[in-house]
């Protein structure tokens, strides 16, 4: 490992190292959100069909998130494993982890592409496409799936750059793809008038740009983790532990769709269109939370994993304490803004007075326990970074599948105001989850010595 990287992860004061790693990681999350918004702006302004085109592309979002979850399955377990091996000084074995994870990402890309080409239309109909939106959704997805390999390699392998403590490089790879996407959107949608197909091709090419940059870096001498052609092969002894560790982050992404469908279905029944619209605004607020907190976690992950491998336990503990304080501060800040100025927050997303009033009410309920959500994020993701796969998987299943989804459907039947009962599912699940996660992590923290 290069002296510069080793010094950053093993010797530099924790606050300075954490900031140096976390700021680019948060910036990368912000860039992703920004270019997704710009993408939708271009699509929404397609002459005469903008509304239907935007709705059609919106239907593809859960499918695209599901595809991305498979990259997380491989990389979010493989990257911490590789970082731990770097900390132990087992560089050759760490390179083999990169190789076998690349092999798996390529295999998943092939399988997902075949599935989407063969069954894309019925899958989109299952996710809510209508007779008006299915032509746009199918067109977009038909092109997008051709670039699945680029998406998998960009998301999957960029994590191995972050794992070295090179978050500025990984942010640059994301930024280059985002810039290419915006330029190509303008050219293909507004210039050549390719419509939704143009937006899809812009996404494919931009992901290709990012993938090339990621691969070039990992193959270069600047990278502490090297992608070597001879290592791109199946190695079950290395791959399966990575998959097990990555199961928790992948489940987090996959279950987001199920949670969203559950909320929308229940709110439509008990609150009508205004409740569903309000939920859309609340989800947008949570996007900002999930922009900040995972960025902080990505900054801490290399420090946690590398120093665990090096058995520098005091440094592991200091990193976690700083991560916990940062996540708590971030979640508290957003909670405070939402609790004190809910109308102002809602008005960012709509100018409808009735919807602003309703969202101000629902925001106080839905985000009531957001102030402690930072504990859940810091502990759960740290379990992944510290190679505690079974606990991380349990906590993911516990919060979303065992607690949240059943509560969404149960509480409306026992609460006087059924719609309020639906919104209450979130803070109740958050509270129980934190009360479970915090003691589990405290016990592990003490066991480190």
Which role fits each region the language model picked out?
Residues 20-39, 143, 177, 206-210, ...:
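Transmembrane helical elements of multi-pass membrane transporters/channels
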Residues 30, 34-55, 124-131, 187-194, ...:
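Helix-terminus/linker motif at the lipid-water interface of multi-pass membrane proteins
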Residues 19, 34-35, 74, 115-119, ...:
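Residue-level signal for transmembrane alpha-helical positions in Major Facilitator Superfamily
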Residues 51-62, 137-141, 200, 273-288, ...:
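Small-residue hotspots at the loop-to-helix junctions and early N-terminal turns
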Residues 54-114, 151-170, 278-336, 340-342, ...:
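Small-residue-rich hydrophobic transmembrane alpha-helices
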Residues 1-24, 82-149, 191-247, 304-369, ...:
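Short alpha-helical transmembrane segments in multi-pass integral membrane proteins
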Residues 10-41, 45-49, 62-81, 106-113, ...:
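N-terminal transmembrane alpha-helices
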Residues 144-162, 170-178, 199-214, 294-297, ...:
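Short runs within selected transmembrane alpha-helices of multi-pass transporters and secretion channels
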């Amino acid at each position: 490992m290069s002296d510069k990287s080793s010094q950053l992860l093993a010797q530099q004061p924790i606050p300075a190292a954490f900031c140096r790693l976390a700021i680019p990681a948060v910036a990368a999350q912000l860039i992703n959100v920004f270019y997704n918004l710009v993408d939708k702006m271009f699509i929404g302004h397609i002459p005469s069909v903008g509304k239907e085109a935007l709705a059609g592309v919106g239907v593809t979002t859960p499918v695209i998130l599901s595809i991305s979850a498979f990259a997380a399955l491989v990389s979010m377990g493989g990257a911490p494993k590789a970082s731990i091996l770097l900390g132990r000084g087992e560089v050759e074995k760490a390179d083999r982890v990169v190789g076998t994870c690349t092999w798996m990402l390529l295999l998943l890309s092939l399988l997902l592409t075949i599935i989407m080409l063969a069954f894309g239309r019925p899958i989109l109909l299952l996710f809510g496409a209508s007779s008006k939106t299915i032509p746009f959704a199918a067109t977009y997805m038909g092109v997008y799936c051709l670039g699945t390999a680029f998406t998998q390699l960009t998301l999957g392998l960029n994590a191995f750059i972050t794992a070295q403590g090179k978050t500025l490089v990984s942010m640059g790879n994301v930024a280059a793809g985002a810039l290419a996407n915006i330029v190509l959107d303008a050219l293909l949608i507004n210039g050549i008038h390719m419509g939704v197909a143009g937006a899809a091709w812009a996404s494919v090419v931009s992901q290709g740009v990012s993938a090339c940059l990621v691969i070039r870096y990992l193959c270069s001498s600047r990278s502490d983790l090297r992608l070597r052609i001879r290592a791109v092969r199946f190695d079950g002894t290395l791959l399966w532990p990575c998959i097990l560790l990555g199961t928790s982050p992948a489940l987090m992404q996959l279950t987001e769709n199920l949670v969203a469908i559950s909320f929308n279905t229940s709110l439509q029944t008990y609150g009508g269109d205004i409740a569903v619209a309000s939920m859309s605004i609340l989800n947008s607020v949570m996007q900002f939370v999930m922009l900040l907190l995972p960025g902080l976690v990505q900054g801490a992950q290399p420090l946690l994993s590398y120093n665990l491998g090096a058995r520098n336990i005091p440094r592991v503990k200091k990193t976690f304490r700083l991560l916990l304080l940062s996540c708590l501060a971030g979640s508290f800040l957003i909670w405070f803004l939402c609790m004190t100025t809910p109308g102002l927050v809602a008005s960012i997303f709509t100018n409808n007075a009735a919807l602003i009033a309703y969202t101000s009410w629902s925001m106080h309920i839905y985000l009531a326990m957001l102030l402690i959500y930072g504990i859940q994020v810091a502990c759960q993701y740290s379990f992944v970074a510290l190679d505690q796969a079974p606990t991380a998987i349990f906590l993911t299943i516990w919060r979303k599948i065992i607690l949240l989804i059943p509560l969404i459907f149960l509480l409306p039947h026992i609460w006087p105001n059924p719609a309020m009962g639906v919104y209450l599912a979130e803070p109740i699940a958050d509270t129980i989850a934190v009360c479970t996660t915090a003691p589990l992590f405290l016990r592990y923290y003490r066991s480190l010595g």
